[in-house]
């Protein structure tokens, strides 16, 4: 089983069409990885599906980096 960090990074790379080497913890989805607002919505939906959780809009707005996504999933896993 992959770690949460590995799973998040894989989803980010797939959703944003970037190389996995570019998906570092400090990377901003918009500034570093070239995501637009639609990309970020789709990314949140993919994270919700992968981790079987619901991310409220107000929380989703705060998930702007790879590390923020990892931290959110870690803190909301049962």
Swiss-Prot record:
Matching entries from PANTHER family are given as:
ACYL CARRIER PROTEIN, CARRIER DOMAIN-CONTAINING PROTEIN
Task: List the Pfam families.
Answer: PP-binding (PF00550)
Write out the similarity annotation: Belongs to the acyl carrier protein (ACP) family.
Q: Where in the cell is it found?
A: Cytoplasm
Instruction: Identify residues that carry O-(pantetheine 4'-phosphoryl)serine.
Output: 37
Q: Name one GO molecular function term.
A: acyl binding
Know the name of this protein?
Acyl carrier protein
- The answer to keyword Phosphoprotein applying to this record is yes
Q: Mainly resides where? A: cytoplasm
**InterPro entries in the record, alphabetically?**
ACP (IPR003231), ACP-like_sf (IPR036736), PKS_PP-bd (IPR020806), PP-bd_ACP (IPR009081), Ppantetheine_attach_site (IPR006162)
- Which superkingdom? Bacteria
Read off the HAMAP family from this record.
Acyl_carrier
Residue ranges of every copy of the Carrier domain listed in the record:
2-77
Pathway(s) per entry: Lipid metabolism; fatty acid biosynthesis
Its biological purpose: Carrier of the growing fatty acid chain in fatty acid biosynthesis.
* Keywords for this protein: Cytoplasm, Fatty acid biosynthesis, Fatty acid metabolism, Lipid biosynthesis, Lipid metabolism, Phosphopantetheine, Phosphoprotein
Give the CC-aspect GO terms: cytosol; membrane
């Amino acid at each position: 089983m992959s770690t949460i960090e590995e799973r998040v990074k894989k989803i980010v790379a797939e959703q944003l069409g970037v190389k996995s080497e570019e998906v570092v913890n400090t990377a901003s989805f918009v500034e570093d990885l070239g995501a637009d607002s639609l990309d970020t919505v789709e990314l949140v939906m993919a994270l919700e599906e992968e981790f079987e959780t619901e991310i409220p809009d107000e929380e989703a707005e705060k998930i702007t980096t790879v590390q923020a996504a990892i931290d959110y999933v870690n803190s909301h896993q049962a």
